[in-house]
A protein has these predicted regions:
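Gly/Thr-rich phosphate-binding beta-strand-loop-beta motif of the actin/hexokinase/Hsp70
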Residues: 1-24, 118, 125-142, 146, ...
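Fold-independent oxyanion-binding glycine-rich loops
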Residues: 7, 65-66, 90-91, 110, ...
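Conserved small/polar residues in nucleotide/adenosyl-binding loops
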Residues: 200-202
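Glycine/small-residue-rich loop that forms an oxyanion/phosphate-binding "nest" at active or ligand-binding sites
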Residues: 81-117
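Acidic-glycine-rich active-site phosphate/pyrophosphate-binding loop
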Residues: 84-96, 133, 169-180
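Glycine-rich phosphate-binding loop plus the immediately following alpha-helix
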Residues: 32-36, 107-109, 114-123, 147-194
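N-terminal glycine/serine-rich phosphate-binding loop of ATP-dependent small-molecule kinases
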Residues: 1-89, 93
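Short, catalytically relevant binding-site loops at active-site mouths
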Residues: 94, 133-136, 144, 153-157
C-alpha cells in the first residue's frame, strides 16, 4: 500500500492507495501544531487500524506540508512507523511540471500534487482549484506549465471570520452539500452563502 499525506493549515489528510493507484481509504485529522512526533505516530497508526491497515503493509509514503513546525515531526514519525521509501513533495523534486513563477520554491507541495493530478486527467490548458484554508486557483498553459494563480480566503476561513466578527451567526459544518440554495434558517443561509460564494469566486 502507498500512503499519501498532506499537512495543511487546518487538517492532515490521508489516502491509502494500491500500487496501481486505486484509492482504498481516505481520512483527515486536525492539524495541531503542538503534536509531537510520537503523538503523530500514534494517530497515524490508529487511523490505519480504523481502515483495517497495518504499518507493515505500507510499501511507500509520499507527503507534502505547508506547516513547517509539523514537517520534521511527521518525517520522524513516518521513519519510526515503516522502513520504506519516504518521498517529500517540495522544492527540488523533479515532477515534470514547469513552474514559470518568480520563485518556484514558494509553490506549496500540495499545489504541485494538484497540478500533476490535473495533467493526468485532462489536456491543458486548464485551471486547477484547491479548496483549503485558502482557495488557490492555478493557471496551467497549453504546454502544461504553471504560469500564475490567485489566492483567496477559503470557505472555512470565510466562515470563521463571519462567526468571529458577528454576535449571532453560528458555526456550521461545511463538509456536506447545502440542502438548498436559499436557506430557511440562519445556519442554512450561512452554509449556502459560504459554499456557493466560494464557487462564484471561481
Amino acid at each position: 500500500m502507498i500512503l499519501a499525506l498532506n499537512i495543511g493549515n487546518s487538517n492532515i489528510t490521508f489516502g491509502g492507495y494500491t500500487p496501481d493507484g486505486k484509492l482504498v481509504f481516505s481520512s483527515r485529522l486536525f492539524a495541531d501544531t503542538a503534536l509531537s512526533s510520537d503523538e503523530l505516530l500514534y494517530k497515524i497508526v490508529n487511523m490505519l487500524a480504523l481502515y483495517g491497515a497495518e504499518p507493515q503493509q505500507i510499501t511507500a509514503v509520499i507527503f507534502s506540508s505547508v506547516v513547517p513546525a509539523l514537517t520534521p515531526r511527521l518525517r520522524e514519525a513516518l521513519r519510526k512507523m515503516c522502513e520504506c521509501q519516504i518521498m517529500e513533495v517540495g522544492p527540488g523534486l523533479k515532477s515534470g511540471v514547469r513552474i514559470r513563477m518568480d520563485n518556484p520554491a514558494q509553490l506549496g507541495g500540495e499545489l504541485l500534487c494538484a497540478i500533476v493530478g490535473a495533467l493526468q486527467r485532462c489536456t491543458p490548458p486548464c485551471v486547477v482549484v484547491n479548496f483549503d484554508t485558502a482557495t488557490t486557483l492555478l493557471a496551467v498553459d497549453s504546454t502544461g506549465a504553471l504560469v500564475g494563480g490567485s489566492i483567496l480566503p477559503g470557505p472555512q476561513c470565510s466562515l470563521s471570520a463571519l462567526v468571529r466578527n458577528t454576535a449571532q451567526l453560528p458555526q456550521v459544518e461545511l463538509e456536506a452539500r447545502p440542502r438548498r440554495l436559499l436557506g430557511a434558517n440562519t445556519a442554512d443561509c450561512l452554509h449556502s452563502g459560504i459554499v456557493y460564494l466560494s464557487l462564484i469566486h471561481i
